[in-house]
Amino acid sequence: MTRTPVNVTVTGAAGQIGYALLFRIASGQLLGADVPVKLRLLEITPALKAAEGTAMELDDCAFPLLQGIDITDDPNVAFDGTNVGLLVGARPRTKGMERGDLLSANGGIFKPQGKAINDNAADDVKILVVGNPANTNALIAQAAAPDVPAERFTAMTRLDHNRALTQLAKKTGSTVADIKRLTIWGNHSATQYPDIFHASVAGKNAAEVVNDEKWLAEDFIPTVAKRGAAIIEARGASSAASAANAAIDHVYTWVNGTADGDWTSMGIPSDGSYGVPEGLISSFPVTTKDGRYEIVQGLEINEFSRARIDASVKELEEEREAVRALGLI
């Protein structure tokens, strides 16, 4: 194996999602079965010991592709020469916490990380923000990294995309492999809009197969949007393995490309497409090739979809104004 290892940084590495993610990265599922990796685990100081325990387990797996592990609490060290950064660590919302407090707390995490990426990362760096509120955390990090092309900062809506695939498959008696061209629009929040109007199920238009707008509005959309809360209710903990899986999917697709005739959903800086204000990090339908993504153009947006996209975009604009007022962007 003569390939130069890819440096992959994972923040919040000792957490639940980090634990579900790291072994899959080290086994080759993030970038490909022939791509060696070096891991950089970034944690807050009190969690370094737990991160060391995870690193011990990674060593004990003897993954042929894993060519080194560094553990640090210094973002400048963690992002030195980074090619792929998975920003998982974030401040979760606690009971009674106002949204402004949440945004402020996360600004204290993502602004310094953005600067560290700006100052230290490799020229080809790709960033995926997983930690919530993911879209706006990505915006904060991106604003702190003016020397890095804006399109390198993305937010994860692939979990919502995957959730929607399964719900649609169940409704139509098909499998997820039968479904193509599903879209998540907007924010990774309860306002997100999973859109089946351009999707296909075994080659047939998904909306026509379903033929039930009441189910879409009252069942499908809320089920996808509130799935995280339902998992916390059932499991007593937030979704970790499914979030890690979606992060793997997001980066793998970004690097290796979407299948012909299909697309995926990514939270990316808007170029003004579909009436989403430029610069907002919003979820769009995208195709990927050679490590680059492009927004799928020319989709007709019906009234049902337009109102829901606009509502989610409005929330993103409000979040942007809130972090601007806090001096975070």
From Swiss-Prot:
Optimum pH is 8.0. One of its GO terms (biological process) is malate metabolic process. Signal peptide: none annotated. The gene is mdh. Its EC number is 1.1.1.37. Keywords: NAD, Oxidoreductase, Tricarboxylic acid cycle. It catalyses: (S)-malate + NAD(+) = oxaloacetate + NADH + H(+). Pfam families: Ldh_1_C (PF02866), Ldh_1_N (PF00056). NAD(+) binds at residues 12-18, 106, 113, 130-132. InterPro entries: L-lactate/malate_DH (IPR001557), Lactate/malate_DH_C (IPR022383), Lactate/malate_DH_N (IPR001236), Lactate_DH/Glyco_Ohase_4_C (IPR015955), Malate_DH_AS (IPR001252), Malate_DH_type2 (IPR010945), NAD(P)-bd_dom_sf (IPR036291). Substrate binds at residues 93, 99, 132, 163. This is Malate dehydrogenase. The active site is at residue 188. It comes from Streptomyces avermitilis (strain ATCC 31267 / DSM 46492 / JCM 5070 / NBRC 14893 / NCIMB 12804 / NRRL 8165 / MA-4680). Optimum temperature is 42 degrees Celsius. It comes from the Bacteria. GO terms for molecular function: L-malate dehydrogenase (NAD+) activity.
